[in-house]
Amino acid sequence: MTWPFENDTSNIEKKLAKRSLHHERQRNLFAIIALVLTAFMITATFSIGFSYFETYQMQQIRLMGTTADVGITNVTENQLVEISKSNLVLDVGIQQRLGSVDTEQLQNARLGIVWIDDTEWEHHRLPTISGVVGNYPSSKNEIMLPTWVLEQMGISDPQIGMEIVLSYQIGDSYNYVSDTFLLSGYYTDYIPMRTNNRGYVYVSSAFKDSLNVSLDNSVTAMIR
């Protein structure tokens, strides 16, 4: 009951209550949106940061040409055994430089003839290259080359099994010999950007074992 001298404020109170509830809902909605946007920005920032770090890390690994952390040159068989036993070592790959290629007919490449074992190839080298076609050499007369070397040889469309003639020397000999090899594989590598066009001609274990020269001081342990 409302007396004559009283004002009926019930409708006003209801309107104020509804308006207050509406504003409260808006504030809650804005708060939720702000939280969602904040969470999104934080997640996006971390994602971009991690992606940048991973990209940078991959670029550095590719420029180095191996995932190994350190290389120890001129190691002996006994030293290799002791290194492999260490709890601090994840794996050990073997690299052996056998000789070099006569690159006088090429533009500016400097190529070493190199053999690496399965660990070095699969765990240290493969992660740093791309566009791999074919396989690592297995026969005595097989080689594997990076595409930039093939291009300097005038080969723009390499084919597995194609013949490639190389003039090369082995060990400390200054006598160059010429042989015809078969291309077992090719790939894209990135170390020439760091090494001023130094590269590798990968050869097989069979080729290495066929050499009648001492290569005792040419073994490098690649440690990760």
Q: Can you name each region flagged by the protein language model?
A:
Residues 23-32, 37-65:
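Alpha-helical transmembrane segments
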Residues 4-15, 35-41, 102-107:
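Short, mixed-charge, low-aromatic patches
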Residues 1-30:
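Feature of multi-pass inner-membrane transport and sensor proteins
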Residues 50-224:
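Basic-flanked hydrophobic alpha-helices used for secretion and membrane insertion
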